[in-house]
From Swiss-Prot:
Gene Ontology CC: one annotated term: SREBP-SCAP-Insig complex
Gene name, Swiss-Prot/TrEMBL: INSIG1
UniProt similarity note: Belongs to the INSIG family.
Principal subcellular localization: endoplasmic reticulum
Transmembrane segments: 65-87, 107-124, 140-162, 166-184, 190-211, 226-243
Site feature location: Required for the recognition of 25-hydroxycholesterol: F151
Glycyl lysine isopeptide (Lys-Gly) (interchain with G-Cter in ubiquitin), cross-linked positions: K136, K138
Protein name: Insulin-induced gene 1 protein
UniProt keyword annotations, A-Z: Cholesterol metabolism, Endoplasmic reticulum, Isopeptide bond, Lipid metabolism, Lipid-binding, Membrane, Phosphoprotein, Steroid metabolism, Sterol metabolism, Transmembrane, Transmembrane helix, Ubl conjugation
Quaternary organization: Interacts with SCAP; interaction is direct and only takes place in the presence of sterols; it prevents interaction between SCAP and the coat protein complex II (COPII). Associates with the SCAP-SREBP complex (composed of SCAP and SREBF1/SREBP1 or SREBF2/SREBP2); association is mediated via its interaction with SCAP and only takes place in the presence of sterols. Interaction with SCAP is mutually exclusive with PAQR3.
Lineage: Eukaryota, Metazoa, Chordata, Craniata, Vertebrata
Mod. after translation: Phosphorylation at Ser-187 by PCK1 reduces binding to oxysterol, disrupting the interaction between INSIG1 and SCAP, thereby promoting nuclear translocation of SREBP proteins (SREBF1/SREBP1 or SREBF2/SREBP2) and subsequent transcription of downstream lipogenesis-related genes. Ubiquitinated by AMFR/gp78 in response to sterol deprivation, leading to its degradation: when the SCAP-SREBP complex becomes dissociated from INSIG1, INSIG1 is then ubiquitinated and degraded in proteasomes. Although ubiquitination is required for rapid INSIG1 degradation, it is not required for release of the SCAP-SREBP complex. Ubiquitinated by RNF139.
Recorded superkingdom: Eukaryota
Record PTM Phosphoserine, positions in chain: S187
Length: 257
């Protein structure tokens, strides 16, 4: 009997030892799925990354074409309206065969203005990204529309207002142009690009007038009007705001989806 009793206790001891050995087996079994499952996400992440990288260039080019078309169309329409306004006020004079056309303007003026608007509108957000200074001041379409209205008003004032001399008119339009920049832009890149655009556009206009393509009435500054750089400056700021707003809508689409 003692031997049987000892044998029973030995069996119970071995049975009691099994529960102590089970957690180790369970821990080992629990570690196996982690080890086998760990490499699984590794091949998935490169595939997702390559798919995203492959989709980005196509979407970026598609967005670039869309923004270019919108800016080009805006430049064409604005050129037709503002140029017609200046012709009616006898500020800009074209040859007689040009005035006989349906739009009372040279055929090359709207395409050139549209191309310039597309270049300027794409350049503004590009310069902002390179400088690392994203423009976030008044980023809504209502502000952009007000900026367009102010720019049209400045151009209308240049053709309609009568001052004692051109210096007073130029100073007034310069103050209005700087006020437009301060109200709707307030960025150093916008100020620098606006001044650069005004300088280059004035040189191109002087070249065209000097070669007899068209002319201005009462020129007072190297064959042109002295207030013309102010118009180019405010136009550059306006088109730049449109380009920034169009570029700002691009990253918002994935978040909305």
């Amino acid at each position: 009997m003692p031997r049987l009793h000892d044998h029973v206790w030995s069996c119970s001891g071995s049975g009691a030892a099994r529960p102590h050995s089970l957690p180790r087996g369970m821990i080992a079994a629990a570690r196996c799925p982690q080890g086998s499952g760990a490499p699984e996400p590794a091949p998935r992440s490169p595939r997702a990354g390559t798919a995203g990288c492959g989709a980005r260039p196509g979407s970026w080019h598609h967005d670039l074409v869309q923004r270019s078309l919108v800016l080009f169309s805006f430049g064409v329409v604005l050129a037709l309206v503002l140029n017609l306004l200046q012709i009616q006020r006898n500020v800009t004079l074209f040859p007689d065969e040009v005035i006989a056309t349906i739009f009372s303007s040279a055929w090359w003026v709207p395409p050139c203005c549209g191309t310039a608007a597309a270049v300027v509108g794409l350049l503004y957000p590009c310069i902002d990204s390179h400088l690392g200074e994203p423009h976030k001041f008044k980023r809504e379409w209502a502000s952009v529309m007000r900026c367009i209205a102010v720019f049209v008003g400045i151009n209308h004032a240049s053709a309609k207002l009568d001052f004692a001399n051109n210096v007073q008119l130029s100073l007034t339009l310069a103050a209005l142009s700087l006020g437009l920049w301060w109200t709707f832009d307030r960025s150093r890149s916008g100020l620098g690009l606006g001044i650069t655009i005004a300088f280059l556009a004035t040189l191109i206009t002087q070249f065209l007038v000097y070669n007899g393509v068209y002319q201005y009435t009462s020129p007072d500054f190297l064959y042109i009007r002295s207030w013309l750089p102010c118009i180019f400056f405010s136009g550059g700021v306006t088109v730049g705001n449109i380009g920034r707003q169009l570029a700002m809508g691009v990253p918002e689409k994935p978040h909305s989806d």
